[in-house]
Amino acid sequence: MSSQLENEASFEATTLGFLWRQFTRPKPLPTGITLAGQVAIVTGSNVGLGFSASRQLLQLGLSHLIMGVRSQAKGDVAAAQLRTDFPFATISVWIVDMESYDSVCAFASRCESLDRIDIVILNAGLIKTPYTVVRATGNEVTLQVNYLSTALLTILLLPILKAKKRVDCSWSPVISIVGSDLMYENEVELEGPVLPQFQQEETFSQFSWYGKSKLLQTMFISKIAEFVNPHDVLVNVSNPGMTGGTDFFRGYPALMMKLIAVGQWILARPVDMAATTYLDAVLVQGEKSHGSFTSDWTIKPYPKIWYTPEGQQLRERLWEETMEELNFVGASKIVNDLKRS
C-alpha cells in the first residue's frame, strides 16, 4: 500500500510532516486480541522499545517470548523482570550479535527448533560515533547492524516462518523490521554502487548514516516482499518515531546527551506509547501492509526517491549488491525458492 501513496511522500519529508507524525494520537488495539499459544521473537529486547513491546505482547497473553539480545547477562536481568510479572509465560533469552554474520546465522538456525513462530520484531539497531568498521566483515557498523545483518536475518527467517505456519490459523506469521522516518530526510547517491558509499569515512555523519541505513532497509523490504506471498508470511517496516526513555544514544558526550534530552522532552513519545507502533504493525495492519512502511498507527508512503525511475534503479542495484554480499548463505536461492514454492 505504501506504493500507492506517492502524493503524500513530499509532505512526509518536511518539518511539518515530522511534527504531524510526532503528535499523532495513538490508536488503541482492537479489543479481543489474544496471543495465547503464540510464539514471538523480539531482538534488542532487553531495554527500551524492544523491552516495552515484549511486555505488551505478554500482556496480550503471549505464551512464549524469545528475547534476542547481545548480552546474556543483560538479557537475563530483563527476562527476570518479565517472568515476575508474567509467571505463566515461557521467556527465553537467546544471543544474537548483529555485528556478526555467524551469530545471526546461529540465531536463525536455533529458530528452526521452535514448533511455531507467529511474530518477529527485528528491533536491534544502533546509531554510533565515531566511524567504526566491523573487523570480521569490513563493513561500517551502522550499515552492518541496521541493514546487512538485518537483511540476512530476514532472509533466513522467512522460509522458517513459512514452513512453521499453522494450518489451523487464519492469520499469517509476520516479520516487522524496525525502521525510521529519518529515511525521509536522507538520500544516498543515485549513481554507482550503493553499499560502498558507507565505506567513505570522510563523509561520515552518525545521524545521516543512520537515516540512510533505514532508507536502504525500506528499499530492501519493499523488494523482498515481491518474493513472498503475504498469505505465507507478512513482512513490513514499523517506525516508532522519536522516542524518549531509551538507551539509544548511550555513549554520547554529556553535552550532546543534554541537548538530545531537551529535544526529546519537547517532541519525543514515551517509550510505551512508541512501542505500540510495533504491535500495530504485527497485529493490526494486516495484508495491506505487506512490503510497506508503517508509522503512527497507519501505513505511510515510501521516501520520495522510491517513486522515481532513478529510485527504482537504485533499489535494483541495492538488491543485487545485497544478494552478492549475503550469498555466502545462498541468499539468492533462498529468496527465489520462496517465490517458486
Curated annotation (Swiss-Prot):
EC number: 1.1.1.-
Pathway involvement of the protein, from the record: Secondary metabolite biosynthesis
Gene3D superfamilies attached to this UniProt entry: NAD(P)-binding Rossmann-like Domain
Residue positions binding NADP(+): L49, K74, D97, N123, Y210, K214
Keywords associated with the record: NADP, Oxidoreductase
Statement: the UniProt record of this protein carries the keyword Oxidoreductase: yes
Annotated disulfide bonds: none
Any one Gene Ontology molecular-function term assigned to this protein's record: oxidoreductase activity
Active site: Y210, K214
Transmembrane segments annotated in the record for this chain: none
Class of enzymatic activity (EC top level): oxidoreductase
Top-rank lineage group of the source organism: Eukaryota
Role of this protein: Short chain dehydrogenase; part of the gene cluster that mediates the biosynthesis of virensols and trichoxide, fungal natural products that contain or are derived from a salicylaldehyde core. The pathway begins with the synthesis of the reduced chain in virensol C by the highly reducing polyketide synthase virA via condensation of one acetate and 8 malonate units. VirA has interesting programming rules since the first 2 ketides are fully reduced, the 3 following ketides undergo beta-dehydration, and the last 3 ketides are only reduced to beta-hydroxys to yield the trihydroxy portion.
Family: Belongs to the short-chain dehydrogenases/reductases (SDR) family.
PANTHER family: DEHYDROGENASE_REDUCTASE FAMILY PROTEIN, PUTATIVE-RELATED, PHOSPHATIDYLINOSITOL-GLYCAN BIOSYNTHESIS CLASS F PROTEIN-RELATED
Annotated protein name in UniProt: Short chain dehydrogenase virL
Organism field: Hypocrea virens (strain Gv29-8 / FGSC 10586)
Gene name as annotated: virL
